[in-house]
Amino acid sequence: MYTLKEGIDFYIEPMQNKKVTVFDTTLRDGEQTPGVSLTSSQKLEISRQLDKLGVDIIEAGFPISSEGDKESVKSISNAGLETTVCGLARVLKKDIDACFESDVGLVHTFVPTSDVQRIYTIKKSQEEVIQLAVEAVQYIKDHGLKCMFSAMDATRTDPAYLIEVFKAVQEAGCDIINVPDTVGVMVPSAMYRQIKDIAAEITIPIDVHCHNDFGLAVANSLMAVEAGASQVQVTINGIGERAGNADLAQTVMSLASIYGIKTNIRTEYLVETSKMIENYTGIRLPPNTPVVGQNAFSHESGIHSQGVLEKSDTFEPGIMTPEMVGHRRRIVLGKHTGKHAVKQSLESAGVKTSENQLDEIVLRIKEIANKGKQITDADLYAVASAVLGKASSEEELIKLKEVSVMTGNILTPTAVVKADIEGKEIIAAKTGVGPVDAALKAVRDILGESNHFRLQEFRIDAITGGADALADVYIGLENEKGRIVTARSANPDIVMASVEALINAMNLLYKKEKS
């Protein structure tokens, strides 16, 4: 057994003397995710965020693919980043020239080496492939740039031939070789053996690029590092072709927290970076996504919640904390919730209860949850207010007075909202793509300088059937400090339900910030 933190032992031997370089391909392979298309300005902003995160190499794109991609790579290359900017190129001079014209510091050139890809895509013999690879490497080195060579589909390539290819490019002056699991067919034990075999024959650094077709990309990357690889290719949120690539956050935190391996990643920016990619790609992470997902440090079970509140190491990894990755710990209320979790949630909003009152609140919360209802912060405070005999409006920032909307097939949807903000009546009118959008924009306008939040989730459900169904609107809000609240409202009028839910959530944020 090995110890990385006092009181917590592992079967994995630490590799604390090793350092791994992080190669991020979010802007190249990540953008090949079906349905994803990033603008040049978004790519530049993402590259600055990756630089802030501490990524060693950014693969900024495939310059030959379009004039726009070439200009985007060039703008990133000249953005004054600390990281090395890389461009992708086939083993063709025109591709490599496009990388030169993009001012990159590293050219990543590749050619298929497996029989299935070599025969059916480029129609070249094994000897011709080696010649193309060597000429490409020499051409790059003759121009004074660093070169990484990829044997595409390496994990389905004849092992002896693969070693022959790598030896040839090494002799030609290649700086680093990449072993890509292009179609994600490796298992960790096989990846370990393959990298071990390559490392025994090759003296230059080894990089791995693992795809996630069977959900093994991160595990394969870790096994490659155990076997001798010193660089991993990853993407933010694991985006990429088909099922994606090895996820940066999961790979880096496993290396750092479990193996004790050093990287240059500033892990406190992991969640921040993940959210940027979510917003720009439109691909939302499942709540249970490791490291950066909403539920990564969330607890509902009474036993788990009580243990975490006493000592977080009891039901969390211990060697990875929410603070390390820029996250927050959450205690979620539901039918499994215990007294400790309810008490902590109430106290975070400044609500004090007696033991008897707390017992009654817990009982009511469980009754609601057992009916299949998701418990929001608003539900908890409404129940607590009823039990404590307090008016729920005592600490409201906003009190809704009136909502009116106009919409139709030829009218621009318009909403007028009247509300009291700390006793001052304010009216706002806004247009939108629909009446709900217009009404929510009007509420934001009323808030003015208090409007420092992100609408994290917006969901509408019909509680009853028929045309007169009750609309149940669920809203999740996150403020600039990363604090998340949830609220809901039910109303036969979908616009009213939406506005009420947003105002309920804003009042909860205000209440929590005051406490």
Curated annotation (Swiss-Prot):
Native source species: Methanosarcina acetivorans (strain ATCC 35395 / DSM 2834 / JCM 12185 / C2A)
The reply to whether Metal-binding figures as a keyword in the UniProt entry is yes
The entry's family comment says:
Belongs to the alpha-IPM synthase/homocitrate synthase family.
What is annotated about its quaternary structure and interactions? Homodimer.
**Name of the protein described by the UniProt record:** Probable 2-isopropylmalate synthase
Q: Where are the transmembrane segments?
A: none
Pathway participation: Amino-acid biosynthesis; L-leucine biosynthesis; L-leucine from 3-methyl-2-oxobutanoate: step 1/4
Q: What does this protein do?
A: Catalyzes the condensation of the acetyl group of acetyl-CoA with 3-methyl-2-oxobutanoate (2-oxoisovalerate) to form 3-carboxy-3-hydroxy-4-methylpentanoate (2-isopropylmalate).
A biological process (GO) of this protein is: coenzyme B biosynthetic process
- List residues binding a divalent metal cation: 29, 209, 211, 245
Top-rank taxon of the source lineage equals: Archaea
Give the Gene3D superfamilies listed for this entry.
1.10.238.260, 3.30.160.270, Aldolase class I (3.20.20.70)
Select a single GO molecular function from the record's annotations and give it.
2-isopropylmalate synthase activity
